UniProtKB/Swiss-Prot annotation:
Positions that bind S-adenosyl-L-methionine: G162, E163, S194, S217, L218, H219, N293
Active-site feature positions: E99 (proton acceptor), C336 (s-methylcysteine intermediate)
Family that this chain belongs to: Belongs to the radical SAM superfamily. RlmN family.
Protein's recorded name: Probable RNA methyltransferase RPD_2859
Lineage, uppermost ranks: Bacteria, Pseudomonadati, Pseudomonadota, Alphaproteobacteria, Hyphomicrobiales
Species of the source: Rhodopseudomonas palustris (strain BisB5)
Annotated localization: Cytoplasm
Free-text remark on how the cofactor is bound: Binds 1 [4Fe-4S] cluster. The cluster is coordinated with 3 cysteines and an exchangeable S-adenosyl-L-methionine.
């Protein structure tokens, strides 16, 4: 990593109640909240659980303190030079801490949130899976990241630590809680779920009544190259991933975005661009081209501007909608692929990335 922050966070402690207040409140829909046994939660309305965002309601804080339960907190561990991006450390009851990112825009804020404690898919270009998968985040833990990132959040991207579709039930429950009209009433059109593409889960997602945005981390045009870049996805055929994603797009009448990380000498040839164009021809799809965000110890390189331009032009000539995506927060290791699983002191968990250049 460009800079591994190591901050003491004494207020992030192990909770006496593992579920914590999130398990009793932020992890519930309004109907579930209304059905709680009388006295289980203080005299707080469902909406008050989410507003104001920055701090939990005082009555909820006092109630939690009287029972020896600490509310999870979000601690800032980095801010980029322009002040547009902030990296946060979200402490968990079991001693782990996942990273979230707040991105400021002129028309609101974007919350980049995590869905798992670690990741099982070991993407070659990403720091988040270096320690493997420890556990899934609960719906309340997912929702609480958004709540603590502040009232100006109007876009949510599941692009932090973890594979959202590998935690399907809790992620979908979190989205429903965020959408609940009696709570945050968050528009689903402001929610983007980014996934490597698990065909079975994509088929299930197709039947959900959720008008979210879907991004598929594709990154290759052949199974061989994708298996090298995303070892955990070897059992998911590339063609089936694309087919399921496009079926979702047709079902919901909205385009699916395919993210493509352009890596020199690996997947950046004109032949790759032509294969990608052929793969997506006449599909309700668009492409986001991305540059690699450096991670310490990973033998990859950022693609030169000229190669990226040639790749983009090839797609445009084939009439495939394409943009080059700009990434915020790279100078504080808060960009895509740079988030680490940490402990409560802010130290990275698990092994560092493998040394050496990918061949």
């Amino acid at each position: 990593m460009a800079s591994a922050q190591r901050h003491s966070t004494p207020d992030l402690v192990r909770q006496r109640d593992p579920a914590g207040v999130s398990g009793l409140s932020l992890g519930l829909t309004s109907s579930e909240f209304a059905g709680l046994h009388e006295g289980a939660v203080p005299d707080v309305t469902y909406r008050e659980l989410f507003f104001p965002h920055a701090d939990p309601p005082r009555r909820l804080q006092n109630w939690a303190r009287s029972r020896g339960v600490r509310l999870r907190t979000l601690t800032r561990i980095g801010r980029d030079q322009g002040g547009r991006s902030e990296k946060m450390l979200f402490g968990l009851h079991d001693g782990y801490a996942v990273e979230s990112v707040l991105i400021r825009r002129f028309d609101g804020h974007t919350a980049c949130i995590s869905s798992q404690v670690g990741c099982a898919f070991a993407c070659r270009f990403c720091a988040s899976g270096q320690a493997g998968l420890m556990r899934n985040l609960e719906a309340g833990e997912i929702v609480e990241q958004v709540v603590r990132l502040g009232p100006k959040v109007n876009r949510i991207v599941f692009m932090g630590i973890g594979e959202p579709l590998n935690n399907y039930q809790q992620v979908l429950k979190a989205i429903r809680i965020l959408r609940d009209r009696q709570g945050m009433n968050f528009p689903t059109t402001g929610i983007t779920l980014s996934t490597i593409g698990i065909p079975k889960a994509l088929k299930q997602l197709r039947e959900e009544h959720l008008a979210i945005n879907l991004t598929i981390s594709l990154h290759a045009t052949t199974q061989e190259v994708r298996d090298r870049l995303i070892p955990g996805a070897r059992k998911h055929p590339l063609g089936e991933v694309v087919e399921r994603a496009c079926a979702w797009a047709r079902r919901h009448n909205r385009p699916v975005t395919f993210a493509y990380l352009v890596l020199p000498g690996i997947n950046d040839s004109i032949a790759d661009a032509r294969r990608l164009a052929a793969m997506l021809r006449d599909s309700p799809a668009r492409v986001n081209l991305m540059r690699w965000n450096p991670v310490d110890g990973v033998g990859l390189q950022r693609t030169p501007d000229r190669s990226l331009a040639h790749f983009r032009t090839t797609l445009e000539n084939a009439l495939v909608p394409v943009v080059v995506r700009d990434t915020q927060g790279r100078d504080i290791s808060a960009a895509c692929g740079q988030l680490w699983l940490r402990d409560l002191k802010g130290l990275p968990v698990g092994n560092r990335p493998r040394q050496g250049r990918m061949t």
